[in-house]
C-alpha cells in the first residue's frame, strides 16, 4: 500500500483538511504525517478553485479516471472501483438560501483505507454535521465509518425535504377539498421537484445497496450493515415519492375538472339569461319595426303597459325555468 504523506496535500488549497485521530476526533494534517487506516486523511476541495483543480490534475495519489470525476465530470449517482480505492458520486439537497432545494448538489468522493478526497462546487450542508462530530470528538474513526456517517446525513436531508414536499402536497389537497383552485405554478413546481428527486435518488439507493453488498476492505461488517439500513430507508422514501407523484396527477385532474365545472356553470348561466330575455327581445324588435306605426303610440299609457307586459313575460319565463328545474 502506497505511503501518503501530509506534504502531498499541501498545494491543494482545500476547503478544509484533517487527519482522523482514530478516537472519533480530528487533528490538522502534519506535513510530515503519514496516513494510515487507523488515522486516515480527509481533504475536501472546491474543484472550481484553480489551485484545487490544478492539484487534482497533477497529483499522483489519484487514477486518471478519478481525477476527471472529482473535477466535475461525474454527475449522476454511481460507484466505480479503481484498485484499492473507490470513486463515488452522490446527489444531495441544496440548502443554500438563494437557490431552490431541488437544484441538487453533486458531491464526489474518492476513498480508500488511508484517505478521503471529496469535492464539490456548491456547498454541501450535509458535511456540517459530520465535521461537527469530528470537531467534538464523536465522529468517524475510519474512512468506512466516515462514509456511513456521510450518507446517513445526506439521506436525512433528503427525508426532510420529502417531508416538506409532502406538507405542500397536503395543503394543495386541502384547497381542493375546500373547492378552491390552487395556482397551476405551485403544482407544477411541486411535481417537478418530486420528479427530479425521484430521478436521482433511485440510482443513489442502488449505490448505497452496492456499497453494503460489496466486500470493500476499508468497510467493516458494521459499516455494511448500517449502509444497508440507510439504503432501505431511502427506498421507503422513494416509495413515498412515487405516491406523492401519483397524488399530484390526481390533483391536476381535479383542478381541470373544477375549472371545467366553473366554465360550464358560467355558460349555463348565460344560456338561461338568453332564454329569459329572448321573448322580450323579440317583442321589442317586432314593435320597433315601424312599418305601420308603433302599436299604442297614440295612447299615453301604451309604453307603461308594454313595459309591464315585458316584465310579466320575464317573470313567467323565470317561473317556468324554475318549475322545470333549470334554475
Swiss-Prot record:
List the Pfam families.
CorA
A Gene Ontology cellular component where this protein is annotated is: plasma membrane
Q: Which CDD domains match?
A: ZntB-like_1
TM spans, by residue?
272-292, 301-321
Q: InterPro entries recorded for this chain?
A: CorA_cytoplasmic_dom (IPR045861), CorA_TM1_TM2 (IPR045863), MgTranspt_CorA/ZnTranspt_ZntB (IPR002523), Zn_transp_ZntB (IPR023714)
GO molecular function annotation: cobalt ion binding; cobalt ion transmembrane transporter activity; magnesium ion binding; magnesium ion transmembrane transporter activity; zinc ion transmembrane transporter activity
Q: Does the keyword Nucleotide-binding apply?
A: no
Q: Which residues lie on this side of the membrane: Periplasmic?
A: 293-300
The record's catalysed reaction(s) read:
Zn(2+)(out) + H(+)(out) = Zn(2+)(in) + H(+)(in)
Compartment(s) of residence: Cell inner membrane
Cytoplasmic-side stretches of the chain, per the record, are 1-271, 322-327
The protein's topology relative to the membrane is: Multi-pass membrane protein
Under NCBIfam families, the record lists: PRK09546.1
Please name the PANTHER family in this protein's record: CORA FAMILY METAL ION TRANSPORTER (EUROFUNG), ZINC TRANSPORT PROTEIN ZNTB
Function, as annotated: Zinc transporter. Acts as a Zn(2+):proton symporter, which likely mediates zinc ion uptake.
- Name the family: Belongs to the CorA metal ion transporter (MIT) (TC 1.A.35) family.
Q: What is this protein called?
A: Zinc transport protein ZntB
Q: Which organism is it from?
A: Photorhabdus laumondii subsp. laumondii (strain DSM 15139 / CIP 105565 / TT01)
Lineage start: Bacteria, Pseudomonadati, Pseudomonadota, Gammaproteobacteria, Enterobacterales
Q: Which gene encodes it?
A: zntB
